Curated annotation (Swiss-Prot):
The name this protein goes by in its record: Riboflavin biosynthesis protein RibBA
Stretch list, region DHBP synthase: 1-204
Cited InterPro entries: DHBP_synth_RibB-like_a/b_dom, DHBP_synthase_RibB, GTP_cyclohydro_II, RibA, RibA-like_sf, Riboflavin_synth_RibBA
Role according to the record: Catalyzes the conversion of D-ribulose 5-phosphate to formate and 3,4-dihydroxy-2-butanone 4-phosphate.
Region (GTP cyclohydrolase II): 205-425
Pathway: Cofactor biosynthesis; riboflavin biosynthesis; 2-hydroxy-3-oxobutyl phosphate from D-ribulose 5-phosphate: step 1/1; Cofactor biosynthesis; riboflavin biosynthesis; 5-amino-6-(D-ribitylamino)uracil from GTP: step 1/4
Length: 425
């Protein structure tokens, strides 16, 4: 196993104006980024970064800073597969030459981090790429963008970093992997940490959710405890339906059956046949009830994969005209999937969950939760109920979004798919 350094050392180095290396999850980019605080940028630091990285230097910024500086999205429809929020590129208006030199880019970085700077201090386009970090940092999105802003803030500096991916010195044309990054860190006296470690540190020292209420909820699947949460970063309320003891005198929080369910008014409440959400929620509650122990976490604010109810209805109009569920979102200028699971992960941790069997057909959901210190020991598939109204939608989820759905090609209205449930499940 690769030797890692402490988050405390990385924070101290950032505060001292040094660079650090941060590695993300192997199921995500699986890359190491060189990171330093933007306000500490010097020509020497920038030249070092350019020499050992791809050279595509970015400056992650807090959302409020982006708003103050008028940094609009680079493209209206973000199609980046990891959701990196690129904004329009910039150069400092004054004190630079062409903008590309290490000295010029250091000047632009420091200006981006300066709380006194305004939008008019920059020219657009330029040679530095600002990125908009998610509010809540790595607890909301486990990316290098958020890690850079978190590290700067934890060091007592302005919420602005500088990042770029380290390239391999052994395999030209590839990005450096973990073992090579450790050697590189030792050669240059740099701290090497992971985003997972940063998440764990923040989880131990900070809390971004609040448990507000708890009540008994009798359902047709038996009785659950409904535990309500709020988040300081979202004006949204979430509910966890809990069955049995998750963690306590007789339970250690391991091997918990968990469903993280995205809100779907049309499917969950109205019984729409355009999606499989309602039947999946019902099946999850039934499976947890039958297990006698588990959690069904109902995530509000995830309507339409995060685009909202009215946008979802607009997307339905486009689907009726021939677009699939992905293209409909993109035509509306919206991402195919805007959900994040950071708050859900914190709720599960608060409930005492340590390891889980995750009820989902969506492998991306596993990645979205796994980066938060929750150990997913198994992905448990949910049964699928296909019909003439949702078969194309299900095929799109399988073919374009990577969902693990089998039997769809053999579907016709009179035949049930493998694992389809009835009222007895």
């Amino acid at each position: 196993m690769t030797r890692l350094d402490s988050v405390e050392r990385a924070v101290a180095d950032i505060g001292a104006g040094k660079a650090v290396i941060v590695i993300d999850d192997e199921d995500r980019e699986n890359e190491g980024d060189l990171i330093f605080a933007a306000e500490k940028a010097t020509p020497e630091l920038v030249a070092f970064m350019v020499r050992y990285t791809s050279g595509y230097l970015c400056v992650p910024l807090d959302g409020a800073v982006c708003d103050r500086l008028g940094l609009l999205p680079m493209y209206a429809v973000n199609q980046d597969k990891h959701g990196t929020a690129y904004t329009v590129t910039v150069d400092a208006k004054n004190g630079v030459g062409t903008g590309i030199s290490a000295s010029d880019r250091a000047t632009t970085m420091r200006l981006l981090a300066d709380p006194a700077s305004v939008a008019e201090d920059f020219t657009r386009p330029g040679h530095v790429v600002p990125l908009r970090a998610k509010d809540g940092g790595v607890l909301r999105r486990p990316g290098h963008t958020e890690a850079a802003v978190d590290l700067a803030r934890m060091a007592g500096l302005q919420p602005a970093g500088a990042i770029c991916e380290i390239v391999s010195q052994k395999d030209e044309g590839s990005m450096a992997q973990t073992d090579e990054l450790r050697v590189f860190a030792d050669e240059h006296g740099l701290a090497l940490i992971t985003i997972a470690d940063l998440i764990e540190w923040r989880r131990k020292h900070e809390k971004h959710i609040e448990r507000v209420a708890e009540a008994r909820i009798p359902t047709r699947h038996g009785e659950f405890r409904a535990i309500g949460y709020t988040s300081i970063y979202e004006d949204v309320e979430h509910v966890a339906l809990v069955r049995g003891e998750i963690a306590g005198p007789n339970s250690d929080g391991d091997d918990v059956l968990v469903r993280v369910h995205s809100e779907c008014l049309t499917g969950d409440v109205f019984g729409s046949r355009r999606c499989d959400c309602g039947p999946q929620l019902d099946a999850a509650m039934a499976m947890v009830a039958r297990e006698g122990r588990g959690v069904v976490l109902y995530m509000r604010g995830h309507e339409g994969r995060g685009i909202g109810l009215l946008h979802k209805l607009q997307a339905y109009q486009l689907q009726d005209a021939g677009d699939d569920t992905v293209d409909a979102n993109l035509k509306l200028g919206l991402p195919a999937d805007a959900r994040d699971y950071g708050i859900g992960a914190q709720i599960l941790v608060d409930l005492g969950v340590r390891s889980m069997r995750l009820l989902t057909n969506n492998p991306a959901k596993r990645v979205g939760l796994d980066g938060y210190g929750l150990h997913i020991i198994e992905r448990v598939p949910l049964p699928v109920r296909a019909n003439a109204e949702n078969i194309r939608y299900l095929m799109t989820k399988r073919d374009r979004m990577g969902h693990d759905l089998t039997g769809l090609d053999d579907f016709h209205e009179s035949v049930h798919l493998p694992g389809e449930f009835g009222g007895a499940l």
